[in-house]
Design a protein with these regions (language model features):
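Acidic (Asp/Glu-rich) sequence patches and key acidic residues
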Residues: 1-119
Length: 119
């Protein structure tokens, strides 16, 4: 299984609609195992991540009002890709590429007034 990242908006209260995301593979957020080995790892928690660790237990829905904080967390994680890559066994390039995809989705969400779904 693969972990994907998408942007969404609410058409009406409680009715989520996924936006069209790029078709170039930039919707990839990692392998299913990266939920626990990377994004939900103790290392991610130790550096101060609060959104990403939710993936260890469930899909991550970043609500529109939390997108700015999520972008800040992406920047925090970006400063630790080498350690996260080593700790998870995925490698720095893998972590950096998946984090870049997630960050771009968050930036699209901010522009659209929407949120981010990692699932």
């Amino acid at each position: 299984m693969t972990l994907l990242v998408h942007t969404f908006v609410y058409d009406e209260p409680g009715k989520l609609r996924l936006l069209d995301d790029p078709e170039d593979g930039s919707d990839m957020a990692g392998f299913e195992s990266s939920r626990t080995r990377l994004w939900g790892s103790e290392h991610a928690r130790a550096i101060g991540a609060r959104f990403f660790p939710e993936l260890a237990a469930d899909d991550l829905y970043v609500q529109p009002e939390d997108v700015e904080d999520f972008i800040a967390e992406c920047e925090l994680m970006r400063g630790h890709t080498a350690e996260l890559g080593a700790d998870s066994g995925y490698g720095e390039d893998y972590v950096a590429a998946r984090l870049a995809n997630i960050t771009r989705a968050a930036l699209r969400a901010r522009s659209a007034g929407g949120g981010v779904l990692v699932w």
